[in-house]
Swiss-Prot record:
Pfam families: SecB. PANTHER family: PROTEIN-EXPORT PROTEIN SECB, PTHR36918. It comes from the Bacteria. The keyword NAD does not apply. InterPro entries: SecB, SecB-like_sf. Keywords: Chaperone, Cytoplasm, Protein transport, Translocation, Transport. This is Protein-export protein SecB.
Amino acid sequence: MSEQNNTEMTFQIQRIYTKDISFEAPNAPHVFQKDWQPEVKLDLDTASSQLADDVYEVVLRVTVTASLGEETAFLCEVQQGGIFSIAGIEGTQMAHCLGAYCPNILFPYARECITSVVSRGTFPQLNLAPINFDALFMNYLQQQAGEGTEEHQDA
């Protein structure tokens, strides 16, 4: 009976925190006089590390760059971190948990932080759409499988 309990999947959020915030408006104040039709670019990255047995830190980095033509209106980067207790899974399931499930939890916090910082820069409201981290993770796995196939073909 105790062996069964040890293999059960457990997941617990220990802490969610803002690890880093950066905001730049390099062309302020003259950018405020321009028509606000920005091109908005969103970059995402995740990283994870094991802190202790069954304890992991996951950091979601979200970078938003708004440009008006060739000029950068603003650049905002947030690193949203979380510490999670995860046990009873391994391999691809653990990779999915750290690379998709945890970022899904962290993204709303990062999105709120970015929205707040951008509004403090007196730019119009920025509403980031939800991100499907499960689909991004599947794309990543497909790319990794494709790269592995290419390496075998080259050999």
